[in-house]
Swiss-Prot record:
Keyword Nucleotide-binding in annotation: yes
Taxonomic source organism: Mannheimia succiniciproducens (strain KCTC 0769BP / MBEL55E)
Protein name: CTP synthase
Region (Amidoligase domain): 1-266
Catalytic residues (UniProt): C379, H515, E517
Pfam family name, one: GATase
Binding locations of Mg(2+): D72, E140
Any one cellular-component term (Gene Ontology): cytosol
Record family assignment: Belongs to the CTP synthase family.
Length: 542
């Protein structure tokens, strides 16, 4: 069966939740037995978000095959079972770099290279490639209609709709329908103007998703339908909700999935949303509360740790607990002392880059170790725990990472210069390598040691988790630290790289070099996060 396409755009303002709405629709279609994939087209000129500031762009989501992508792909994987790959996200920068590479190679046979047709053709080719083999591909265009940056993407999708046939495509437009308290009513004019903007570039939306803080009344939906050339049943109200996992049921209750299946002439079963009902039931009926202190460098923007935040919530669902996250700036630990860490049931130190705030993270690991506070370290969170143990238990008082001190006499953490990627190919790096796209990335196998907490939590010997780092434990100094008691409980497939460490004689102190948050979902959770939150709850009783 040829792929059907749903193109998702946004209007009026940014941050309307296109990714969540698109992922929720994908979840309903998947629940109807359809094979669904999703794509995000980002109109910025960076080749990928890998070198962008987390406080500007939010987290970088790493796919199984090692692509550094937009955080919306994390939403996609949390809502549907399909795993995202490098084909599911591309940027203006990636498109232009590929077109320029082809031009230098002579692929265009001396033609004048232009936005139309060369850039738009490259966009279309990538969308078709990413959608291949699926019943439905939902393609989200980043930004807001009217922005100059997104014009090539919109033109490419307009052309693609003509080429594959309008009966195989749906344009779904998210727009804001604000409520004006002084007037006591919602206003439809912003939506009308947004649709007018879309029409000016040749796109007639088929479905309108109306974002508001309340349900849009039927008379206002009828008005929107009339003035935007859309059937009334295709004007969907999407109000603010207390949980994003309510949105699939909210969209289904208004018949959005039926409308789409009818348009595409898809004969499929009714959606079974029972798994999502279970998620909502557990969320609404917690048996207790737990507070996790997250000590990071980018805490002013919680989206910098989006997948970690969600993974903690998923662990709360698994344990029937309401998880409260207390964000603590690691620099505050340096300047104000360990008092800022008090009052939490567990401590999580997530990933990060650069020296700023690192000593605060090391102090945090020491506080958790010495006070028997459950600790989960991720990526840099493992490295600081390793440095702390080396300094204060193993007697390597000058221990540090070469990332923070290139002349460190005891570099217990150093640059990885060679490793195997997920395909078995050997990757090599040096200190002079580019920052972008040069880390150990994507899913890697990890061997768990018998009798370890990690082995107990996962329940198997070999796991696969996603990585994003260029520094690792220095094996030269590792024997001294192991002799002081630290347990290495997870190793890379070739047994050369340390993946998990555990502190002995501690209720729960586990740190991993990989990023378990990227594989946590609301329906399945993740064993490390579930075990950590459970240990934090048990810590309350002491």
């Amino acid at each position: 069966m040829a792929t059907n396409y749903i193109f998702v755009t946004g209007g009026v303002v940014s941050s309307l939740g296109k990714g969540i709405a698109a992922a929720s629709l994908a979840a309903i279609l998947e629940a109807r037995g359809l094979n669904v994939t999703m794509m995000k087209l980002d109109p910025y000129i960076n080749v990928d978000p890998g070198t962008m500031s987390p406080t500007q762009h939010g987290e970088v989501f790493v796919t199984q095959d090692g692509a550094e992508t937009d955080l919306d792909l994390g939403h996609y994987e949390r809502f549907i079972r399909t795993k995202m790959t490098k084909r599911n996200n591309f940027t203006t920068g990636k498109i232009y770099s590929e077109v320029l590479r082809k031009e230098r190679r002579g692929d265009y046979l001396g033609a004048t290279v232009q936005v139309i047709p060369h850039i738009t053709n490259e966009i279309k080719a990538r969308v078709i490639e990413g959608a291949a083999g699926h019943d439905v591909a939902i393609v989200e265009v980043g930004g807001t209609v009217g922005d100059i940056e997104s014009l090539p993407f919109l033109e490419a999708l307009r052309q693609l709709a003509v080429q594959v046939g309008r009966e195989k495509t749906i344009f779904m437009h998210l727009t804001l329908v604000p409520y004006i308290p002084t007037a006591g009513e919602v206003k439809t004019k912003p939506t009308q103007h947004s649709v007018k903007e879309l029409l000016s570039i040749g796109i007639q939306p088929d479905v309108l998703i109306c974002r508001s803080d309340r349900m849009v009344p039927p008379n206002e939906r009828a008005k929107i339908a009339l003035f935007c050339n859309v059937p009334e049943k295709a004007v969907i109200s999407l109000k603010d909700v207390d949980s994003i996992y309510r949105i699939p049921a909210l969209l289904q209750s208004q018949g959005l999935d039926d409308l789409i299946c009818q348009r595409f002439r898809l004969a499929c079963k009714e959606a079974d949303l029972s798994e999502w009902e279970q998620v909502l039931y557990r969320q609404a009926n917690p048996t207790g509360d737990v507070t996790i202190g997250m000590v990071g460098k980018y805490v002013e923007l919680p989206d910098a740790y989006k997948s970690v935040n969600e993974a903690l919530k998923h662990a709360g669902l698994t344990n029937r607990l309401n998880v409260h996250i207390k964000y603590i700036d690691s620099q505050d630990v340096e300047t104000k002392g360990i008092d800022v860490l008090k009052g939490v049931d567990g401590i999580l130190v997530p990933g990060g880059f650069g020296y700023r705030g690192v000593e605060g993270k090391i102090l945090t690991a020491q506080y958790a170790r010495e006070n028997n506070i459950p600790y989960l370290g991720i990526c840099l969170g493992m490295q600081v725990a390793f440095i702390e143990y080396a300094r204060h238990v193993a007697g390597l008082t000058q221990a540090n990472s070469s990332e923070f001190d290139k002349n460190c006499p005891q570099p217990v953490v150093g640059l990885i210069t060679e490793w195997q990627d997920a395909d078995g190919s050997v990757e090599q790096r040096s200190e002079n390598s580019d920052l972008g796209g040069t880390m150990r990335l994507g899913a890697q196998q990890c061997h768990l040691i018998e009798g370890s907490k990690a082995r107990e939590l996962y329940g198997k010997e070999t796991i696969e988790e996603r990585h994003r780092h260029r520094y690792e434990v220095n094996n030269t100094l590792l024997p001294q630290i192991e002799a002081a008691g630290l347990k290495v409980t997870g190793l890379s497939a070739d047994k050369k790289l340390v993946e998990i460490i555990e502190v002995p004689n501690h209720p729960w102190f586990v740190a991993c070099q990989f990023h378990p948050e990227f594989t946590s979902t609301p329906r399945d959770g993740h064993p490390l996060f579930a075990g950590f939150v459970k240990a934090a709850k048990e810590n309350q009783k002491k």
